[in-house]
Amino acid sequence: MRDIKAMLPEEIAAALAEMGQPKYRAKQIFQWLARGVTSFDEMTNLSKDLRAALSERFFISKLEMLRKQVSAIDGTIKYLWQLGDGNAVETVVMHYKHGNTVCISSQVGCRQGCAFCASTIGGLIRNLEPSEMLDEVLYSERESGSKISNIVLMGIGEPLDNFDNVMRFLALVNHPDGENIGMRHISLSTCGLIERFDDLAARDLQLTLSVSLHAPDDATRSKIMPANHGRGVAALIDACARYYEATGRRISFEYAMIDGVNDTPEHAKLLAKHARRVCAHVNLIPLNHVEERAFRPSTPEHLKAFIRILERAGVNVTVRRKLGSDVDASCGQLRKKVADHRA
């Protein structure tokens, strides 16, 4: 059976044509799926015979909510979803003045091994399907009662390590007959799988590419991000430059401030050099505490000094607002906690 929620309208139309059904039915079905229906019987403008025929050929992906945590501080919501095979992923809904943002996962686990991240503990289990990523958006919207206006692929997993499925998810969530979320309202985060940068640039998508840099030199970056081995910061910055030249889209450098690791004035000066070269925005991230990791966030004094150096160098810099600190909102924390409890 085929996963119909992972199909675009033209693909549904082609399948319907083989069943002797008119093309316009594809749009109806796609719109029903975008509303989050879980069975063909809910598609009330289709005949019973067609609904039965669809049930024999296709399945509709579903999620089951295992946990929901709501921050008493800022209303951030964290969901833990169970997938059809029993695995679990996390999704976070964040409320801003400009709208509601959902942070989705792209993989079950992660193999990139970043030393400060909870998502990599336990490694990669599997890639998420396009329909499962779409479900993260649809189910979060339904359960929270909040219309989602922005998507960030910054949850569990490395999106570029699941390239084809992520590209199809983007086509689905961007489709005007579906969620219709514009590409300019979508950010994709990567730890730097530079072999995929040119492929992404060739798609000419208007999304924001956020590069999880976290250190401006090989010595520091290789210690905390194994993905740097065999690539290197120089090659990563070169890839960013090519991406910027090809797309005209400004890149964001994500930079978790880690006490005594990557927060010295020398780090700030080198980061400024890289950012100026590719016209990148720098987003500094106060490090989230992870029980299994020994790292601590930079002190407020070090953070302020770091910002001053970047600003004096002419770099556009912001500090990420810390949301959901009381609900395990750092990606991977809730999933691991529940998995440990089950074990």
Question: Where do the model's predicted regions map?
Answer:
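Auxiliary Fe-S-binding modules of radical SAM enzymes
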Residues: 1-89, 241-250, 255-343
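Short linear Ser/Thr-Pro motifs
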Residues: 71, 105-106, 119, 189, ...
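A generic beta-sheet turn/junction motif
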Residues: 72, 84, 95-97, 192, ...
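Helix-turn-helix/homeodomain-like alpha-helical modules used for DNA recognition
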Residues: 79-105
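Canonical Radical SAM [4Fe-4S] cluster-binding loop centered on the CxxxCxxC motif
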Residues: 95-132
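Conserved alpha-helical substructure of the radical SAM core
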Residues: 120-150
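Conserved AdoMet/S-adenosylmethionine-binding subsite of the radical SAM
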Residues: 141-150, 155-313, 317
